[in-house]
Amino acid sequence: MAKRYRAAAIGRTGSGNYGHGLHIAYAGIDKVDFIAVADPDGAGREQARQLTGATHAYADYREMLSTEAPDLVSVCPRWTDCHLEMVTACLEAGAHVYCEKPMTWNLADGDTIVNRADALGRKVAVAHQAVYLPRIQQLRVLLREGRIGQVQQIHAHGKQDRRGGGEDMITLGTHLFNMMRYFAGDVGWMSGHVTVDGRELEPGDVGEATEPVGPVAGDCVEAYYAFDSGVAGFFDSRRDQAGSSQRYGMEIVGSEGTISLRGGAGSELMIYPHPVFRPAAADQGWEPLEGLPDDPLATGNRLAIVDLIEAVEQDREPVSSARNAVAALEMILGAYEAQISGGRVAMPMARREHPLVAWRERQNT
């Protein structure tokens, strides 16, 4: 008889809530019984219980873990200040975890989660939903089959709204960096330039983000990534740019064409099937990339849970694993490290503390 999985979710109403619906991703999944939610807020807890159909609800997530012994747990809050404690508690209780992004705000905490999961034989998946979508997975197949020739460059762009710069880079950029790695593999080294009002970054520019996702700095970030595969990667984000709602996405440039992916789920996917970009050429234009499914980004949560179960049963890494999350975070924090050091940053980064925290501490001693 096939194993059935007992699932639960941890939320924190008013302090990161339930993220982007990580608690409601289990509905209709074969082999899963959703049994419990935990939330210190009474009203939020009851609402989550009703939405998920959970039999039990707890104010204390540790009590839930001890009493219910779930096999799968969603760590839902958007805020990263609780992720290390919650994820490690789940792992130590014997559960596999689906965690909201960013998984951690610093590399040391991410390393702790990766190492603890390995030691306990547990899997951790992270809510970078796009890479679970059939549309994005099939796009990777097309790239590997040479649809645009040899992939040479990936240009990624943040949303560039009021959070543009450093906050955009951690809040939404984490999806882009994870996707860049999904297409191009590991980064060998990187460089970056972070500025405020056109001047070089100073220690006094370091502040907190709108939500607790670690320290941020800069209203303009431009970064370069040298992938081991030979692909050159670029990221840019500036604060309060015109058309910010349409900027988020990337262009994948190949030797024989270019693919434009706009939005988190790549719902606006176009191809320029020509080796040289010639806007004036009447016979050369952008075309829809046909034949790929178009699923909403939220579908990725359900697919991530299905993949997590398969990863457990096949003893493999999830598509978007804790290791992937740490590597994406390195691409973010490496921009600060490059700005502060004034040079290239080798990957993986040698120093695992947050570069902005370490910089401020050095300035204060």
Where are these regions (language model features)?
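N-terminal Rossmann-like dinucleotide-binding module
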Residues: M1-T52
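Predominantly a Rossmann-like dinucleotide-binding segment in NAD(P)-dependent oxidoreductases
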Residues: T13-G19, K123, A130-P215, G342
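Conserved SAM-binding strand-loop segment of SAM-dependent methyltransferases
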Residues: A54-D60
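Contiguous beta-strand/loop segments that form the cofactor/metal-binding neighborhood of enzyme cores
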Residues: H175-M270, R302-P318, L333-A335, A350-T365
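Active-site loop of classical SDR/Rossmann-like NAD(P)-dependent oxidoreductases
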Residues: P293-I305
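Short, Asp-centered acidic motifs that coordinate Mg2+ and/or phosphate
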Residues: A36, H56, L72, Q153
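Beta-strand-loop-alpha-helix segment that lines the small-molecule cofactor/substrate pocket
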Residues: T67, L72, R78-W79, H83-Y132
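C-terminal helix-rich "cap/oligomerization" subdomain common to oxidoreductases
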Residues: M1-R4, A9-I10, L72-S74, D111, ...
